[in-house]
Curated annotation (Swiss-Prot):
Record-linked InterPro entries: Ribosomal_uS2, Ribosomal_uS2_C, Ribosomal_uS2_CS, Ribosomal_uS2_euk, Ribosomal_uS2_euk/arc, Ribosomal_uS2_flav_dom_sf
CC terms in the record's Gene Ontology section: cytosolic small ribosomal subunit
Residues recorded with modification N-acetylserine: 2
Domain of life assignment: Eukaryota
GO MF: structural constituent of ribosome
Region Disordered, residue ranges: 215-261
Reported function: Required for the assembly and/or stability of the 40S ribosomal subunit. Required for the processing of the 20S rRNA-precursor to mature 18S rRNA in a late step of the maturation of 40S ribosomal subunits.
Main location: cytoplasm
Subunit structure: Component of the small ribosomal subunit. Mature ribosomes consist of a small (40S) and a large (60S) subunit. The 40S subunit contains about 33 different proteins and 1 molecule of RNA (18S). The 60S subunit contains about 49 different proteins and 3 molecules of RNA (25S, 5.8S and 5S). Interacts with RPS21.
Natural source organism: Scheffersomyces stipitis (strain ATCC 58785 / CBS 6054 / NBRC 10063 / NRRL Y-11545) (Yeast)
Protein name: Small ribosomal subunit protein uS2
Pfam annotation, one family: Ribosomal_S2
Length: 261
């Protein structure tokens, strides 16, 4: 697929894709994903062509931006690493997020409270989000999916070849799609303007790791406070020696005592 020059992959974006290991695919290859394989490493890992990954990102963004009502786009992720990215994508683009377990009947059973009628569905992994793809096929909803080399492509209309198992790879792909959608909608004025949102915001964060970091920061703060030097003016264990015999109040006391006799 040939893209206009304005949609070309920039060196900065290529570095981001490589740094997040988007190009590292699985060892098994599904027959429909062979065109996306750049080469196979000696250890059996299939290297994905990031040029084709970028083309599919732009195509997916143009499809999403073409939907008049942003809430008619449903973004799903049953995979844990993609749930934070899906929620952030929905917050920035106005899509409808389905993070966590996909309730059967979301797209087909209108009696359920969570029933939805989206015009487009975007999923993180065709394997873990198989129920969403299956129900989309029943009601003729087009599907965009982040697919690894061994991912099934049945009922997937647009496949974005990438590493859909790493938390950095998943987060970066969702971030790039969101940025392209905002550029096409005109929220980001031109392609030379940097988006203020960093890709790190889309990365999965382990709750236990966050708590551990907070505890370490609190401990560091306590250590700093304990090690702070004490000023000379502050309270100490020493008391000043005062000669009460030489104080100005002694003669007055003696005079008062003498007058009583």
């Amino acid at each position: 697929m040939s893209l206009p020059a304005s949609f070309d992959l920039t060196p900065e974006d290529a570095k981001l894709l490589l740094a997040a290991n988007v190009h590292l695919g699985s060892k098994n290859v599904q027959v429909h994903n062979k065109p996306y394989v750049y080469k196979t490493r000696p250890d059996g890992v299939n290297v994905i062509n990031i040029g084709k990954t970028w083309e599919k990102i732009v195509l997916a963004a143009r499809i999403i931006a073409a939907v008049p009502n942003p809430s008619d786009v449903a973004v799903c992720s049953s995979r844990t690493f993609g749930q934070r990215a899906v929620l952030k994508f929905a917050a920035h683009t106005g899509a409808t997020p389905i993070a966590g377990r996909f309730t059967p009947g979301n797209f087909t059973n209108y009696i359920t409270r969570s029933f939805k009628e989206p015009r487009l569905v975007v999923v993180t992994d065709p394997r873990t989000d198989a129920q969403a793809i299956k129900e989309s096929s029943y009601v003729n909803i087009p599907v965009i999916a982040l697919t690894d080399m061994d991912s099934p492509s049945e009922y997937v209309d647009v496949a974005i070849p990438c590493n859909n198992k790493g938390k950095h790879s998943i987060g970066l792909i969702w971030w790039l799609i969101a940025r392209e959608v905002l550029r096409l909608r005109g929220i980001i004025p031109d392609r030379t303007t940097e988006w203020s949102v960093m890709p790190d915001l889309y990365f999965y964060r382990d709750p236990e790791e966050i708590e551990q970091n907070a505890a370490e920061e609190a401990k560091t703060t306590e250590d700093v406070e304990e090690a702070a030097p004490v000023d000379a003016d502050e309270w100490t264990g020493e008391t000043e020696e005062v000669d009460w015999a030489e104080s100005g109040a002694t003669p007055a006391v003696e005079d008062a005592a003498a007058s009583n006799w």
